[in-house]
Every structure is written in C-alpha cells, then in structure tokens.
Design a protein with these regions (language model features):
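Flexible "arm" and connector segments at domain edges
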Residues: 1-64, 68-108
Length: 108
C-alpha cells in the first residue's frame, strides 16, 4: 500500500464508518495519546522499566498503525499529501545531512 492509497482508504473508512472526521484539535489530542501508547511499549519492552503483565500482549505494530491512522486523518483534513511531504522531507534531510552522520564520531 502506498501513502496515497492509505490516505484514500482512511478517507473512505471515515466516510463509511465514522460519519465525519473529528476536528483537528481532537485528532491532535488523539495522536498524542496514540504516540504515548507506543512510547509506553517501547519504554517497558526495550528500556529499563519492567514490562507490566497487562502490557506483555500489546502489539507494537498495531499501536504504530493507530498513530499512522490518526496522522493520516490529520493529513487528509489539512490537505497534506503525505507522499509529497515525505519526499520533500527526505530531500531536505539528504541535502542537509549528507555528510553529517558519516562524520559523527559517536556513530562509528
């Protein structure tokens, strides 16, 4: 699935099952909540905190997909083409950082 397909599928899902998009501020709050759920899994599974028994069956991929879903909703609402935005962002990073990371002694 491409980002463009994902944006179309989310839009269709919202129109078919969700009635309408939540407003942008509500979706921003939801995005923050979903990112927090990903952070909790990462912190407990890969960080120094112990993982609670109730968190051991949480699916990291599913939580990341929740983040992506809400991000796509926000992109659709605000007219952002994620394919174009990601390409521009990668181009910017490539031009800005093409030698920076290679020269970073901490990464060697």
């Amino acid at each position: 699935m491409t980002l463009e397909n994902a944006q179309q599928q989310v839009d269709e899902w919202i129109k078919t099952h969700g009635v309408r998009y939540f407003n942008e501020l509500t979706n921003m709050a939801m995005l923050t909540e979903e990112v927090g759920e990903v952070a909790r899994i990462i912190a407990r599974r890969y960080g120094e905190q112990s993982e609670k028994e109730s968190d051991k069956n949480k699916d990291l991929g599913d939580e990341m997909a929740d983040v992506l879903f809400v991000l796509i909703c926000l992109a659709n609402q605000t007219g952002v083409n994620l394919t174009d935005a990601l390409q521009k962002n990668l181009d910017k990073k490539t031009n800005r950082d093409k030698d920076r990371h290679k020269q970073n002694e901490k990464l060697k």
